[in-house]
């Protein structure tokens, strides 16, 4: 089994010119290789909805983890409920941080995300994901290369130094148009905020509509020297 500890650059190749740009082949390999030990950490944005639909073709009881920071839009929680109805076999887990928002405010001050967004993301996303991935050799992510410079060199299979794991990214060759074309063709239900100028959706206090079509993540942490929540750095 390919793991972080015995990592070697994978020699396996996946087709990039098939209708799924390799995504379905990657998922079949990953679930065949890791089985129930493979976890998908999903934000339930549009890429997540597409990837869940593809996952369901391969493993109908897959484990999906949502990092429930307690700060998400109500539309995001409503989207999760609709996903549960459409894919009843999935094991969708809402992983909460150790600290409630009230406890975090007591320890670190009110609205930590406004003063120390990196610390807030660490407490409410990074630590919970580390706990969720404990004992799992690999996890799935919906990263795409065209999401921005920090993701441009992502491979199908990646040695993940942050979580000491193997990060599997089936959608790396999908474009924004590919995502929406698949969504339309398969009549997928998605977060309505995408239709209101939010191509990338995270916690409500730190997410605004995108300011430029060239940078789909330009609405995240607006006005701050921050582009990632810490999960993919």
Swiss-Prot record:
Its main location: cytoplasm. Its cofactor is [4Fe-4S] cluster. It holds the Pfam family PAPS_reduct. Pathway: Sulfur metabolism; hydrogen sulfide biosynthesis; sulfite from sulfate. It is found in: Cytoplasm. Induction: Up-regulated by sulfur starvation and repressed by cysteine. Also induced by O-acetyl-L-serine (OAS), a direct precursor of cysteine, maybe via inactivation of a putative transcriptional repressor of the cysH operon whose activity is controlled by the intracellular levels of OAS. This is Adenosine 5'-phosphosulfate reductase 1. It comes from Bacillus subtilis (strain 168).
């Amino acid at each position: 089994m390919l793991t972080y500890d015995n990592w070697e650059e994978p020699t396996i190749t996946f087709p990039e010119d098939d209708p799924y740009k390799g995504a379905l082949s990657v998922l079949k390999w990953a679930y065949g290789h890791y089985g129930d030990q493979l976890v998908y950490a999903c934000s339930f944005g549009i890429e997540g909805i597409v990837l869940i639909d593809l996952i369901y073709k391969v493993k109908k009881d897959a484990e999906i983890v949502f990092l429930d920071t307690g700060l998400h839009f109500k539309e995001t929680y409503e989207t999760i409920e609709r996903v549960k109805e459409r894919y009843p076999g999935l094991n969708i887990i809402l992983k909460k941080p150790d600290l409630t928002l009230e406890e975090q405010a007591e320890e670190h001050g009110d609205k930590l995300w406004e003063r120390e967004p990196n610390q807030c993301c660490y407490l409410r996303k990074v630590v919970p994901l580390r706990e969720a991935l404990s004992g799992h050799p690999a996890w799935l992510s919906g990263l795409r290369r065209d999401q921005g410079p920090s993701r441009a060199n992502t491979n199908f299979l990646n040695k993940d130094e942050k979580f000491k794991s193997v990060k599997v990214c089936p959608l790396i060759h999908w474009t924004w148009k590919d995502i929406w074309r698949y969504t339309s063709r398969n009549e997928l239900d998605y977060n309505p905020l995408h239709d209101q100028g939010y191509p990338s959706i995270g916690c409500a206090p730190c997410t605004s509509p995108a300011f430029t079509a060239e940078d789909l993540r330009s609405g995240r942490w607006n006005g701050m020297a921050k582009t990632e929540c810490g999960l993919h750095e």
